[in-house]
């Protein structure tokens, strides 16, 4: 199976050595470590990475480079034109159009749902980009591609809507939290050892 990792699970659950270790395990189990180009962009220190996560983020990017050079990473291009970009754009239009509605955003600012800094820098527009990119890829082949994310799937400023659940229902995507994914990998390792 191809396991797409989301930004939150990479930053919160992985370090470089764990990433490389897992990729090595995948080699033995015929699973694939995968990311989207948008996830890799989200890992770059800057507006989207918290200051406290900047060093870890740099380290993860170095680990990703090792995986790329070792041919242990599959990267999906969502930013370029094609079916993944089309899927991504549809998801963003359908579920995140409210982030381009200035009246909606001003109300969120007044309620304290968006910080003044987010409003000023317009970083709120990019909320959940990584999750959307993973869904855009997974919906093309939901039996072979799963998403590993500890994000709950709630849409920014519309927490009653769960994006992961929407696409589980409509496109049969598979989403695993870190612990669930780790158990699956351990089962795969044990079954490979027995074979």
Write out the residue ranges for each language-model feature:
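Active-site-proximal, substrate-binding regions of enzyme catalytic domains
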Residues: 2-142, 153-195
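Acidic beta-strand-to-loop metal/phosphate-binding motif
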Residues: 146-151
